[in-house]
Amino acid sequence: MSVVGFDVGNLSSYIAVARGGGIETMANEYSDRLTPSVVSFGEKSRTQGHAARSQAITNYKNTLSQFKRFIARQFSDPSVQKDAHVVPYKVTQLPNGNVGMQVQYLGETETFTPEQIYAMILTKLKATAEVNLCRKVVDCVISVPQYYTDLERRGVIHAAEIAGLNCLRVISDTTAVALAYGIYKQDLPTPEEKPRNVVFVDCGHSSLQVSVCAFNKGKLKVLANASDKNLGGRDFDWLLAEHFAVDFQTRYKMDVKSNQRAWLRLMAECDKTKKLMSANATVISMNIECIMNDRDVSGKISRADFEALAAELLKRVEVPLKSVLEQTKLKPEDIHSIEIVGGSSRIPSIKETIKKVFKKECSTTLNQDEAVARGCALQCAILSPTFRVRDFTVTDLTPYPIELEWKGTEGEDGSMEVSHKNHQAPFSKMLTFYRKEPFELVARYADTNLPLPERRIGRFKINGVFPTAEGESSKIKVKVRVDGHGIFKVSSASLIEKLPAQAEDAMEDSSPEENGPSKEEGSGASQSENDAPMDQSPVEGGAGEGEASADKEEQAENGAKETSKDKDQTSEGSKSDKESKDQNSEGSKSDNGSTETDAKATKKNKKTIKTHELTITASTDELSIAEVNNFFEKEGKMIAQDRLEKEKNDAKNAVEEYVYDMREKLCDKFEQYVSEKERGSFSKLLEETENWLYEDGEDETKSVYQAKITSLKKIGDPIENRYKEKHERPVAFEELGKALMLYGKTLDLYSQGDEKYSHIEKDEMAKVEKCLKEKEAWRDSKTSAQNQKAAYQDPVVTAQQIRSEIQSMKFICDPIINKPKPKPKEEPPKDNGPTPAEAAKDGGPAPTTEGEEKMDTGDQAPTGEASKEGETKPDETKPDVEMELD
């Protein structure tokens, strides 16, 4: 299972993967870890990444970039209208009111949705990851800006589906950065201690995002988010471009804004100038050749002038920085550090602004370009069952407050706030309604400062609602949830029906099929009925965990009630038992009869609860399943077209490469291996092929190019083989000579009676001698014949044939020469009488050796002088092994 994280930015994208115990950032076919977020369309194929960016000026009308800002947005959105005037391609309105991007593709006018273009970039990133991992990539985690709404997050998930990916989690950019920061920290405070507050600032190409996170060991909690979705590096580029446009108008009387290609070139140069100013405080020069009307332009700007121009933009940088402090009620001294990421965070004036607000130096311990992708890969590893990752809990938050609206039973409208701003996510809440018929819930954002003009999230219809047997409103429990993606949904709905005792007996007799899908609950309901239209019980865990915890609490509460009731009944029963001792048997029987009657009445009045699962019909403005499937099929066709075009271009390039390579070698390396006549005809054919490539053969099929190179190789391969054989044949003949010499020496030793070969029969050695004579004769004849051939003629013998002769000679000679000597015959052991074990078995005394006798003697008590001399004191007894300890 692959563990991959994708950071799809407004300007560029990165891929990170978890493997080898760490996180790696993948490089593409250009050995670059950065892949431009650009897709370009042509008459025959489309290109993504670096190849597409190279066409951003020459094919600007069909080159799409900055598509992230159009996902799930209406064409009438003011921000869409602003961006539509910035991008060089045509932005149109789709029938459903969303944004479409119009290009010329395969000779036809095509309109693509932003989700499709996003999927095309994911397809490119997926292919790059698969090349590096040598396996299929399916599961992934994708980053999105923290300010993305519900619809935009759904759009990213649909884009992943179109690209054939399973998005395990959509994670905010700053949350991914915080995860990449915190999971490796070993000095975080323990859960019981005060958390470490860290600010993360991500200044990218089109937006500024700020987040405050609290860290404890093994835990990350996002406290607050703030952003400016219209403030990024491109705004500083526009500022410079406007400055130089006015300058060129004044000095050169040239309006570069009137020419789209000239404006794009100026924007590219301004981006380079901005980067140079970030690293140098000196005056930076700009020179653009033939920008417009075959005229060159030049300009200069210093960092001080640039910062003066950007004063208004720098003031806007302070707004989200101060906002997170206000939301969290933190002071600058409560902040441990400020981590900055994003390409635009390298601008010195932005760093100074951050320092001024937080009164601390900015920290750059994270990779400013790759931190988001690395955090995505870590999140994917945490979610993957195939990876063991250090326990680390991530608690994100909802960027906007969410409210529910509904129509009451008597026509009045009702509403309530499901989650406030910065509510922790994911979360679930259980809501209770009382209805007689199906009803509809409308979810919308409560924040009026939403980046989208449309605040509605979706409509959710609760189906299958029916009244009680008495005609009253039924109790409906609805669970709403914001999941790990940050997407709101109504996850489940159920109708609680109370059944009397007789209904219970009938239900027990009926089959499950007759009752339908339902489940039984105990007598205690999770929530009591009241006059309020609804009540709620927040569940902070996951959906399953929330239900389980609620059920456990209900069971525990009900169990406690039943236990206390049983105790009361037991005490009453014991009292009645004591009283019954003083009564006669008839009185006891009457008491027992009345007790049984009361028990039957209690059983008759007992009610049970039956739960009916209800269906939910969701209606949102996201892509439908049919649209996603249709786009998936189109993406597959485009991938096949791209592959076919690539194979065709590779075949064409192979023909062109062969023509140039062979034409050069005919006059250099292969000159003496081809006759004058053959060289002339082959050179003419190569020239004709070159002309054909640029004329009639400029756009042919793959098979035509393959046939062309095959016909050329029929002439060129024999020439190349002559050159190859000229260099390999002497080496092969030398190997044959060494083998003949080795076997010849063996024959000499055998004839001299060498003991090493004395076991070999004469007939066998005669076979070796005969084989050597045949190979020597073959070598001499082939060498003589080859010497009579010219270099441009085909060889008499090849190096492969010579090596085959060597192998055949070894096959005959080696088994004979390497034949092992037979082992000498072993004499049977002499009979020296029975062994000690056999003697003991027969009952006789076992013979002992001299050593054994000495050991027996040593075990006996010493006598005489010998015993005195051999006697040792207990303190002087030596151990069996002496060890010297250093």
From Swiss-Prot:
Residues 549-584, 866-886 have a biased composition (Basic and acidic residues). Gene3D superfamilies: 1.20.1270.10, 3.30.30.30, 3.30.420.40, Actin, Chain A, domain 4 (3.90.640.10), Substrate Binding Domain Of DNAk, Chain A, domain 1 (2.60.34.10). Pfam families: HSP70. GO terms for cellular component: cytosol; nucleus. It is found in: Cytoplasm. The keyword Nucleotide-binding applies. Its main location: cytoplasm. Residues 585-594 have a biased composition (Polar residues). The keyword RNA-binding does not apply. Keywords: ATP-binding, Cytoplasm, Nucleotide-binding. Residues 501-614, 775-795, 813-886 are annotated as: Disordered. GO terms for molecular function: ATP binding; ATP-dependent protein folding chaperone. Belongs to the heat shock protein 70 family. This is 97 kDa heat shock protein. It comes from Mesocentrotus franciscanus (Giant red sea urchin). The lineage of its organism: Eukaryota, Metazoa, Echinodermata, Eleutherozoa, Echinozoa. The gene is HSP110.
